[in-house]
Amino acid sequence: MAFMSMERSTWAFTFGILGNLISLMVFLSPLPTFYRVYRKKSTEGFQSTPYVVTLFSCMLWMYYAFVKSGAELLVTINGVGCVIETVYLAMYLAYAPKSARMLTAKMLLGLNIGLFGVIALVTLLLSRGELRVHVLGWICVAVSLSVFAAPLSIIRLVIRTKSVEFMPFSLSFFLVLSAVIWFLYGLLKKDVFVALPNVLGFVFGVAQMALYMAYRSKKPLVASSSSAVVAAGLEIKLPEHVKEVQAVAKGAVAAAPEGRISCGAEVHPIDDVMPSEVVEVKVDDEETNRTDEMAGDGDHAMVRTEQIIKPDMAIVVEV
């Protein structure tokens, strides 16, 4: 009996070490993404939510491992995970636009500081011993299930676009491997809170791998540029202040002395412009300043590029 118990402990330790190594690979998988963010000095529309939630999950599991005896291998991997996710989020906050930085800061304050603080306070004050372990265990299970369910949006995107661009096979493979290893670790340690969420993690990982095999050779659906941007999570913003650009007949150009008309508009003949050419129209500073003084609103005229439809028309920029 003692031999079987020793053998079980040995296997549990072995699977725990393997789980640490594989989970480390999963934590490091976004490195190419953040290297690109660092190189381009832009987050390119990437979302910070997965990293905030992963950091929250690591914090909870590390707290659980401190409370439960004999869970040192959970402390090591989740401690490393906290450090890695913190570095990712620091880079995101450094290069993200202001709106994304504000949203990320709010999530960190609300989830990783606010909610985690409440959980720690309640479990420390209102529970003791095994009760505290069970309360924390079920909380960790709930958070882990939400983390494993997060790829559902990616699965939906793959089915809609027929493209596996957003779901690399290597990440899905390591997620499945990690789920199997940690399930066996929890089984050998008789820790249901570790084993249970990894069952769902295994199911979702296998589903992602099956989708990858199904769609890897299929041609992705062709979408418009705006649809592709929206699918990637980017936001399209138009200029807020654009001066009106109108087309008038060439006769108006001939009637206007020195290329100007009485309403204060500048006229540019475009006889030699082909229909497919693009003309950039600029408003000179002198005319802009004169108009701003008359209007009194402080708006600045902007430059706008227009597609010329007919070669016998002229562009008039109202200033």
From Swiss-Prot:
MtN3/slv domain boundaries: 13-99, 135-219
Protein induction: By the X.oryzae pv. oryzae (Xoo) transcription activator-like effector (TALe) proteins (artificial TAL effectors).
GO biological process, one term: carbohydrate transport
GO cellular component, as recorded: membrane; plasma membrane
Top-level taxon in the UniProt lineage: Eukaryota
Locations listed in the record: Cell membrane
Key words of the record: Cell membrane, Membrane, Repeat, Sugar transport, Transmembrane, Transmembrane helix, Transport
Membrane-spanning parts: 11-31, 51-71, 73-93, 107-127, 135-155, 168-188, 192-212
Extracellular side: 1-10, 72, 128-134, 189-191
Cytoplasmic topological domain: 32-50, 94-106, 156-167, 213-319
One GO MF term: sugar transmembrane transporter activity
Membrane topology field: Multi-pass membrane protein
Chain's role: Mediates both low-affinity uptake and efflux of sugar across the plasma membrane.
Family the UniProt entry places it in: Belongs to the SWEET sugar transporter family.
Quaternary structure, from the entry: Forms homooligomers and/or heterooligomers.
Protein name, per record: Bidirectional sugar transporter SWEET15
Organism per entry: Oryza sativa subsp. japonica (Rice)
Gene designation: SWEET15
